[in-house]
Amino acid sequence: MEKIFQNVDIKPLLIDFSNPFIKNAAKKLFQLEEQLPLVPVNVMMDFKGINRATVHGLSRVLQDEIPNYMLDIKPGGYKIEDSTDLFMTEQFVRNRINFIPIYAENETLVFALRSLNNSCEVKTIYSRDLIQVAGPKLKYPIFNPTFEIGFLQPGKSLIIEDIYIKKGIGRKHAAFNLAVKTHFSHLDIEQYPTDKKEYMALSGYKQSSMTSDPRHHRLGLCFPAVPLPRINQVVRTYLKNACRVIIGRIQNIQKIYENFEEPQPELVLFSMDEEKTKAIITIKDETHTIGNLLKTCIYEMIPDISFVGYQCIPHKQEMVLTIIHKASQEDLITLLEKSIQNIIQIFQTLEKNIDERIA
């Protein structure tokens, strides 16, 4: 298989200390003389030879379907009796803490916030005011000191214990999002000039991406908190992890039909007539991301297939894949296996290309 990962552009968003206004503001507010330990990183990638659903799947997984970390407050951690500023409610402060971008590798660290305003002015509480109270000594900070957590009126206090690191995925809570601002476009579909798009209310492409079958794509995204000394290493790890997550989820589907001769509640196979076979596969806790990827890749591998579609059932937390084809049960399973293997091969190749492209 040819190289899928054609090009990558990695750009950290650094503070422009050459600008006197920015330099003075950074020094006055945060006593900064150098770059912050964590920086947002924009990544632009070009892919070739894969379908639209593959890029969409990678985009969705990188954004909100891959495990990541956030800061949260344990029940009882917000000390109401010791926090005297009525404007700083638990929910207000919790949301601010949740959405501090962090770079964490485990869940062993615990922080606290113990702030008292002894001045005559309103005091702004920043993430730098969080103190570590448990866990191993940090070699590098896991968050920047510049995020606003709350505000204290003169003479008031805010006490929070047990601020811990929580693991989850972005589709359950947006604070877990690994990447943000994900977007992709197709480079092999002719587009309208910018001036025409403005007054003709056009989408941009002269042909629908749903019918033109684009094979050359550009995916852009931003990782909001990457350690400055290890930008390439971290970006490479994130991209490879996304490929492995997709491979793992596809392999879970593979396990359902491996022994299809034995009765399995997740797999239903029956003959509709003498020629057609219908397969219904139920996949637990799966999303449109994998459904769309499977549907597209099965159509590509079996162009004359009668039907392939999927339905996500949120209240059951499952996805149901339906396939109808002019084949025996054994032949249908064989064709499905080839489609699954093709998806796995694509993401294994992509993972290898990432290693080659990002040093």
Curated annotation (Swiss-Prot):
Protein name: DNA-directed RNA polymerase RPB3-11 homolog
Recorded family membership: In the N-terminal section; belongs to the archaeal RpoD/eukaryotic RPB3 RNA polymerase subunit family. In the C-terminal section; belongs to the archaeal RpoL/eukaryotic RPB11/RPC19 RNA polymerase subunit family.
Inducing stimuli: Expressed in the early phase of the viral replicative cycle.
Subcellular localization(s) per the UniProt record: Host cytoplasm; Virion
GO CC field: DNA-directed RNA polymerase complex; host cell cytoplasm; virion component
InterPro entries: RBP11-like, RBP11-like_dimer, RNApol_insert_sf
Organism of origin: African swine fever virus (isolate Pig/Kenya/KEN-50/1950)
GO molecular function, one term: protein dimerization activity
UniProt entry keywords in alphabetical sequence: DNA-directed RNA polymerase, Early protein, Host cytoplasm, Transcription, Viral transcription, Virion
Function noted in UniProt: Component of the DNA-directed RNA polymerase (RNAP) that catalyzes the transcription in the cytoplasm of viral DNA into RNA using the four ribonucleoside triphosphates as substrates.
Any one of the GO BP annotations: DNA-templated transcription
Source taxon at top rank: Viruses
Subunit structure: Part of the viral DNA-directed RNA polymerase that consists of 8 polII-like subunits (RPB1, RPB2, RPB3, RPB5, RPB6, RPB7, RPB9, RPB10), a capping enzyme and a termination factor.
Pfam families: RNA_pol_L_2
Entry annotated with the keyword Transcription: yes
Principal cellular location given in the protein's record: host cell
